[in-house]
Swiss-Prot record:
This protein's GO CC annotations: cytoplasm; cytoskeleton; intermediate filament
Region (Linker 12), start-end ranges: 229-251
Region spans: Tail: 391-450
Family: Belongs to the intermediate filament family.
Protein name per Swiss-Prot or TrEMBL: Keratin, type I cytoskeletal 25
Region described as Disordered: spans on this chain: 1-26
Region annotated Linker 1, chain positions: 115-136
Organism of origin: Pan troglodytes (Chimpanzee)
């Protein structure tokens, strides 16, 4: 945006009459008393504010009614209408400045309130008093810890009961195996006993057979003895010259002795065989029983050792499982707390970023408003200089606002002679239409007498 005052032809202006020009804070008017038209200012003076051209809008939204100074002078023509137009434009500028200052004050108040509520070192929600919930939270934490402890104790008791049941089951299985082994040994001994019983029965049968045979021989011998005794009972004497006969008694006695010796020999042989077999069998049984007993004792001891080791292993596994459960629960709790803290940190960072963004935006808006204010002040000063002439002084004490005291903006046109004046108003602007500097340069000024 630019404010240019192009130089036209150098002309002489008669000395204007003395008048006064007053500007007040709001709704002020120009007091007309100047009857001189300054013809030294050519056409081409325009007011452009906020990137608007002649007749455009200001940055605050108020219309900027541009005006053009014609060749006949600044206040030539209808002076009252021109001054009223300038008065209205200046009043609209001041109203816009007041509105912007009020908006700026409102924003500053909001920023101050926000910093008082959510300033550095504070956090959302800390202005509330949650101390009355702390005992309830502690009580709930204690209840949770007690419940966790009781659950762990119940789990340990269940594990111990399961281990005890497993121990009893192992003992039952071991005793059952031992019982089956003893039954197998008893069955084997029963088979041996049956064999011995069969051998004994055979020997008894042989003994009975020999006894019957001996009884039969004794009976025959007795009958023969009776026959011989009956035959010898008569007194028949017969002398015969014959060979001596066989003595039957001696023969029978010899036969009886032979059979008795044979029976005794058989009995002794059977008894010796029976004793020998029984002794060897008893020795074998004793050896087997000793080996079985030692093996059974060793097996029982090994089974007891195995049961003890299995019980210890189950106890260690249960302890390991409970510790793993406790570790998992602790890790899950700490992970949940860490996630909650990270969520809070993320929310606070987002809130801080939002606050910084809003602060930057408000800062930029404040700078824009301040630039607009400075531009308005410079434009008012430029108006005063243009209205008052080269020697006119625009004494401005500011206008009533938050940061500046109230005062009167006035311009006094001093008496001067005819002068040839060439003036230029130079403004430097940037790409965003922001005014950097404003200068009013008087190129040439010469005083002349009437």
């Amino acid at each position: 945006m630019s404010l240019r005052l192009s130089s036209a032809s150098r002309r002489s202006c008669p000395r204007p009459t003395t008048g006064s020009l007053r500007l007040s804070g709001g709704g002020t008017s120009f007091g007309t008393g100047n009857s001189c038209g300054i013809s030294g200012i050519g056409s081409g003076f325009s007011c452009a504010f906020g990137g608007s051209s002649l007749g455009g809008n200001t940055a605050g939204g108020n219309p900027c009614a541009g005006f053009t100074v014609n060749e006949r002078g600044l206040l030539s023509g209808n002076e009252k209408v021109t001054m009223q137009n300038l008065n209205d434009r200046l009043a609209s500028y001041l109203d816009s400045v007041h509105a912007l200052e009020e908006a700026n004050a409102d924003l500053e108040q909001k920023i101050k309130g926000w910093y008082e509520k959510f300033g550095p070192g504070s956090c959302r929600g800390l202005d509330h008093d949650y101390s009355r919930y702390f005992p309830i939270i502690d009580d709930l934490k204690n209840q949770i810890i007690a419940s966790t402890t009781s659950n762990a104790n119940a789990v340990l008791q269940i594990d111990n009961a399961r281990l005890t049941a497993d121990d009893f089951r192992l003992k039952y299985e071991n005793e059952l195996a031992l019982h089956q082994s003893v039954e197998a040994d008893v069955n084997g001994l029963r088979r041996v006993l049956d064999e011995i019983t069969l051998c004994r029965t055979d020997l008894e049968i042989q003994y009975e057979t020999l006894s019957e045979e001996m009884t039969y021989l004794k009976k025959n011998h007795k009958e023969e003895m009776q026959v011989l005794q009956c035959a010898a009972g008569g007194n028949v004497n017969v002398e015969m010259n014959a060979a001596p006969g066989v003595d039957l008694t001696v023969l029978l006695n010899n036969m009886r002795a032979e059979y008795e010796a044979l029976a005794e020999q058989n009995r002794r042989d059977a008894e010796a065989w029976f004793n020998e077999k029984s002794a060897s069998l008893q020795q074998q049984i004793s050896e087997d029983v000793g080996a079985t007993t030692s093996a059974r004792n060793e097996l029982t001891e090994m089974k007891r050792t195995l049961q003890t080791l299995e019980i210890e292993l189950q106890s260690l596994l249960a302890t390991k499982h409970s510790l793993e459960c406790s570790l998992t629960e602790t890790e899950s709790n700490y992970c949940a707390q860490l996630a909650q803290i990270q969520a809070q940190i993320g929310a606070l960072e987002e809130q801080l970023h939002q606050v910084r963004t809003e602060t930057e935006g408000q800062k930029l808006e404040y700078e824009q408003l301040l630039d607009i204010k400075l531009h308005l002040e410079k434009e008012i000063e430029t108006y005063c200089l243009l209205i008052g002439g080269d020697d006119g002084a625009c004494k401005s004490g500011g206008y009533k606002s938050k940061d500046y005291g109230s005062g009167n903006v006035g311009s006094q046109v001093k008496d001067s002679a005819k002068a040839i004046v060439v003036k230029k108003v130079l403004e430097e602007v940037d790409q965003r239409s922001k005014i950097l500097t404003t200068r009013l340069r008087s190129l040439e000024e010469k005083s002349q007498s009437n």
